[in-house]
Amino acid sequence: MTNMSWSFLTRLLEEIHNHSTFVGKVWLTVLVVFRIVLTAVGGESIYSDEQSKFTCNTRQPGCDNVCYDAFAPLSHVRFWVFQIVVISTPSVMYLGYAVHRLARASEQERRRALRRRPGTRRLPRAQLPPPPPGWPDTTDLGEAEPILALEEDEDEEPGAPEGPGEDTEEERAEDVAAKGGGGDGKTVVTPGPAGQHDGRRRIQREGLMRVYVAQLVVRAAFEVAFLVGQYLLYGFEVPPFFACSRQPCPHVVDCFVSRPTEKTVFLLVMYVVSCLCLLLNLCEMAHLGLGSAQDAVRGRRGASAAGPGPTPRPPPCAFPAAAAGLACPPDYSLVVRAAERARAHDQNLANLALQALRDGAAVAAVSADRDSPPCAGLNATSRGAPRVGGLASGTGSATSGGTVGEQSRPGAQEQLATKPRAGSEKGSTGSRDGKATVWI
């Protein structure tokens, strides 16, 4: 076998080792050591002379070949090689599916990371869906804002990873446990439940559990089929001689087998290896079933112990829809740009501040009118009369101006007490001259 073939086989075994449980790794070790190596090294040397040393007590040409065909319809070594190939086929197919799925997942994660990266990309107007009846047109929403992030929920399973570079401590522990150690060649033992699942939770997180169980079932079925076929072909013992009566043998002849005891021991060893592989398959299926059941029980206990969760967040259309006078259809949420919502909030604050200033000014004016003393010398009727601006005569204006000036000086009440008659006469004189006069 060339170096390229050995390197390909090594990479293949490493990939199978990385995507299997602990019991699966033991099965792989048994397959490589006790089947491939034992068949290639021991079986080839033991069964190398199985036909050349198979002799019959006759000289009839062709009798030896016919009798050997009756003794071993299929060579032991070739039967075991075919068994190894068929039993390894489900694992190889599972590995191909796992590599393909992980490659697609990594490509999707890379694209999702590029979408999550901040940028200045804008959504084209042509790709926007038409608004429902009664909703504002999307073209009137103003200039498009830069897209900072896009959230995608597609192709995400219950245990899937959140994003690139966001592996939890449990996932990092699983990766270290799957690799089998650190860079210095020492085995890293991860304490806690993260280091005890032996790849089972990693297979669940990658979404490969169903395919893994299916290949286990197919592999176990192949093991049972080859065990039955080996028993029907060879039994449990290689006999030292074989009686043959086929044509062209002239009569019943005795044929003798080379090293029958050694071949019997090797045949029994291969039976044991096949039974061990079948047992490992059954143990692995039981391990997966019990582990999944334990995880389900722990999840229920954790959910019951956690109690009620946090208060759910209100839908995003509660405030913007009420402010804009819109109503959200069923199962829909109204999304409003952050800039428009901020501008609306600032406008509301400005309106509230202006209204507060107006209310304060009105209250101050009312309180000032209530606290000011009434003008002395004027009766209630003249104080309550409405004032007409711009129509008072010069005499009336002077009189009113003098009255206001006198109110501001001390002793104004005594001076006003001596002037009401003169003021009345002046007002009468002004009315005689035909000028409009207003009594204040």
Swiss-Prot record:
Disulphide linkage map: none
Segments for region (Disordered): 108-199, 369-440
Tell me which Gene Ontology terms the entry assigns under biological process.
cell-cell signaling; response to toxic substance
Organism superkingdom? Eukaryota
Residue ranges, Cytoplasmic side: 1-21, 100-223, 286-440
What parts of the sequence cross the membrane?
22-42, 79-99, 224-244, 265-285
User: What protein name does the entry list?
Assistant: Gap junction gamma-2 protein
The organism encoding this protein is Mus musculus
Species lineage, top-down? Eukaryota, Metazoa, Chordata, Craniata, Vertebrata
In the UniProt record, the gene name given for this protein reads: Gjc2
